[in-house]
Amino acid sequence: MLFRGQIRKMITQLAEPVQYYLNISGDIIHLNELFGKKISIQHIGYQCIECGSSEPVFRMGFCKKCFFESPFASDSILKPELSTAHLGVEERNLEIEKNIQLQPHIVYLAYTGDVKVGVTRESQIPTRWIDQGATFALPIARTENRYEAGVIEVALKQHISDKTNWRKMLQNEYEEEIDLLDFRNKIESLFPVESRKFAINEEKIWKIDFPYTAPEKILAFTLDKHPNFSGILQGIKGQYLCFQNGDVINIRNHEGYVVDIEI
């Protein structure tokens, strides 16, 4: 069966294990049903996720023009502490920025090979954690807007990483030794004084079961360097497809790529 279209990040459904669906221009492919089967991917072009142009993807699925103009690629998307919608100050499009920023946000701890701190809209739980490949996650603060969550994250990331090391995430090491409750208790004092009112004492640690077993070796590839790829799908974690022999590809990093996929 052949599918042609634009890659978007995989759709996920929390289950045991997580269910994954590949979205190719609206064609939805249930990937869990394809484990042990051959998938061929051929890169044939680009389609910006914002304007639809065939210009090469610059970053995050956007062409260069849209990356520097779209409110969905503004600085506050990557750095919540730069949010200004709560002040009525526009970055690129105030109405869109209000919709994104002026809603409850969660500051969380997650285990993705190391313990990390992060920020997400409350409505994006647990999708955000699944996309990051977090096997454990714990909300530690709930704020009224994105800026407030960013202030907490800035304070905490002086002591804890806010990045995911994709290789460690895919190696599955030390997962059973992580106690996020204990970790939270140790860092509560690092909250800015004015932000401590947002702290929450969740007792439930989220555990996410991925359809994935770490291979002996991991070799990441991109469609830029390998525009024609075929392999046997073995597992999925985060936004990574893992094939036989340890070849892995980050689907989210290929948003906006146009491909032929044969199953």
Name the predicted role of every residue range.
Residues 1-263:
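Non-catalytic accessory segments flanking enzymatic or RNA/DNA-binding domains
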